[in-house]
UniProtKB/Swiss-Prot annotation:
Keyword Glycoprotein: no
Native source species: Lactococcus lactis subsp. lactis (strain IL1403)
Protein name (record): Transposase for insertion sequence element IS905
One Pfam assignment: Transposase_mut
Keyword DNA-binding on entry: yes
Signal peptide region: none
A single GO BP: DNA transposition
Length: 391
């Protein structure tokens, strides 16, 4: 007989309120899980020497009431010094639970193992849910994956960003595989992850498949596609969206320049290159590019010839100036990819592709929900102009 069961029998024997018993048990369990989540996030237990000089630490807590079907529980939400910890147990600003299975699914999606969930459920409810049972409950999240891939998208997107990032995945052996990601912004400035494809390496077949899926989900026209210049991708884009203009990421170009010139020249070259994408208009940008190439070609002939032969360097100047800063590079989608990597550090690796997809869709849905409440910088000032670019 577990301690939980013993306490429950004593409660019943004393004819006390059974809801109060479950409320206090749930309160204890939830607070314990919050502390366990912070330990997992930091990577060490309280007072562990591993945490010394780790770059982050515990930083007290704040109180929150949380409404459950058993009554109000008092939670002590732990904080980290860097302010990056967000407990999976509670949605942002959430103050009410919906259902046990929803909590199980949420924990599973965010990386808590089935065994850890099983342990906490046993403490909360007094009977054992095996990891296999938890896993079966969590498979409901697979429906979210299908819904994500099949949902209807807007007909027109002003900007489409394409970029890949790598995450560890087990297929017999563990290796990092490429997540091909498409992120779009509507003329009104609504930003969202539109879709993704998983493959062992970045490849044009996967990009083609992803763009085909986006068309099937309703995207008819795209004004501008921003990429890092993956070989062959420009042709794939032209086949899918022949009217779309294309922009090469100028930050990638800048990094490439830095890697091919002498260290003594690097700072000057990079500073001069910035004048090309910070010009007041297209005419001045073209002149800045010509001056840049003319100055450095005698010393770096092959590098400058490669730059001369690179297409789609200044396409972004054809769009309203209010959004130039957002569309001359893939920085926007790269920021998303960095956040994905940060979030998945806790997970280490994914046991199969289905687990990876469940996790990605959770992250993407959360991202899309947050972005749905915002208008991306600059788009609100030129929405009518951007809309007029479509047929």
């Amino acid at each position: 007989m577990t301690q939980f069961t013993t306490e429950l029998l004593n409660f019943l024997a004393q004819k006390q309120d059974i809801d109060e018993f479950f409320r206090t048990s749930l309160e204890t369990a939830m607070n314990d899980l919050l502390q366990a989540e912070l330990s997992a996030f930091l990577g060490y237990e309280p007072y562990d020497k591993v945490g010394y000089n780790s770059g982050n630490s515990r930083n007290g807590s704040y109180s929150r009431q949380f409404e459950t079907k058993y009554g109000t529980v008092q939670l002590s939400i732990p904080r980290d010094r860097n302010g990056n910890f967000s407990p999976a147990l509670l949605p942002a600003y959430g103050r009410r639970d919906d259902h046990l299975e929803e909590m199980v699914i949420k924990l599973y999606q965010t990386g808590v193992t089935t065994r850890e969930i099983s342990d906490i459920i046993e403490r909360m409810y007094g009977h054992h849910y095996s990891p296999a049972t938890i896993s079966n409950i969590s498979k409901a999240t697979q429906e979210n994956v299908a819904t994500f891939h099949e949902r209807s998208l807007e007909a027109n997107y002003s900007v489409l960003f394409l970029d890949g990032t790598y995450l560890p995945l087990r297929r017999g052996t563990v290796s990092k595989e490429c997540i091909h990601i498409a992120l779009g912004i509507t003329p009104e400035g609504q930003k969202a992850v539109l879709g993704y494809e998983i493959a062992p390496n970045e490849n044009n077949a996967s990009w083609s498949t992803l763009l085909d899926k986006l068309q099937n989900q309703g995207i008819q026209q795209v004004s501008l596609v921003v990429t890092d210049g993956f070989k062959g991708l420009e042709q794939i884009i032209s086949q899918a969206y022949p009217l779309a203009k294309q922009q090469r990421c100028l930050i990638h170009i800048s990094r490439n320049l830095a890697s091919k010139v002498k260290r003594a020249d690097r700072a000057v070259i990079l500073e001069q290159f910035k004048t090309i994408y910070r010009a007041e208009n297209l005419e001045m940008a073209v002149q800045a590019l010509e001056n840049f190439i003319a100055e450095w070609k005698p010393k770096y002939r092959k590098v400058m010839e490669s730059l001369e032969n690179t297409d789609n360097l200044l396409t972004f100047y054809q769009f309203p100036y209010q959004i130039w800063h957002s569309i001359y590079s893939t920085n926007l989608i790269e920021s998303l990819n960095k956040e994905i990597k940060r979030q998945t550090k806790k997970k280490v690796l994914f046991p199969n592709e289905e687990a990876l997809e469940r996790y990605l869709v959770t992250l993407f849905e959360d991202y899309n929900f947050k972005q749905s409440q915002r208008i991306h910088k600059g788009f609100g000032q030129c929405a009518d102009t951007l809309e007029s670019l479509f047929d």
